[in-house]
Amino acid sequence: MTVSFRPTADLVDDIGPDVRSCDLQFRQLGGRTEFAGPISTVRCFQDNALLKSVLSEPGGGGVLVVDGGGSLHTALVGDVIAELARANGWAGLIVNGAVRDSAALRGMDIGVKALGTNPRKSTKTGAGERDVDITLGGVTFTPGDIAYSDDDGIVVVAAGD
């Protein structure tokens, strides 16, 4: 499903006080600073095997929201996984945790937002959950809803709105 990008500030103006605007302050780390698409989710803690498996599938222009528990101890995404996501048609990644290879990520045509960076690799046991509601910064990211992301922040709109 292709979603036309709209600036988050315009969405806030149009939707009004009930807007689902994420309060968490993510760093813009990917080469694409504006992205939008249907949400898929992964919840994993310091383990990126499930995340890599999901990004190995066709993304269809989607946005993968990753709840890493806010951990900055290990990176959940690096250049190899980000390139896998880009090659499989994902529009962007929103990571409640750390990423690595930030210089390489800036040169890739994919959106990547994360709390920060850490060069340490994560474990690879496959622990985690997929396609579950994830609440970050006062907003629930529900699979199938639409995420819009730019330099101003992240807004979530219910599918069909």
UniProtKB/Swiss-Prot annotation:
What is this enzyme's EC?
4.1.3.17, 4.1.1.112
Reactions it catalyzes = 4-hydroxy-4-methyl-2-oxoglutarate = 2 pyruvate; oxaloacetate + H(+) = pyruvate + CO2
User: One Pfam annotation, family name?
Assistant: RraA-like
Q: Looking at the keywords, is Metal-binding present?
A: yes
**GO molecular function terms listed in the Swiss-Prot or TrEMBL record:** 4-hydroxy-4-methyl-2-oxoglutarate aldolase activity; metal ion binding; oxaloacetate decarboxylase activity; ribonuclease inhibitor activity
The cofactor note from the UniProt entry for this protein is:
Divalent metal cation.
Q: Which GO terms describe its biological process?
A: regulation of RNA metabolic process
Q: What is this protein called?
A: Putative 4-hydroxy-4-methyl-2-oxoglutarate aldolase
Taxonomy, top ranks, is:
Bacteria, Bacillati, Actinomycetota, Actinomycetes, Mycobacteriales
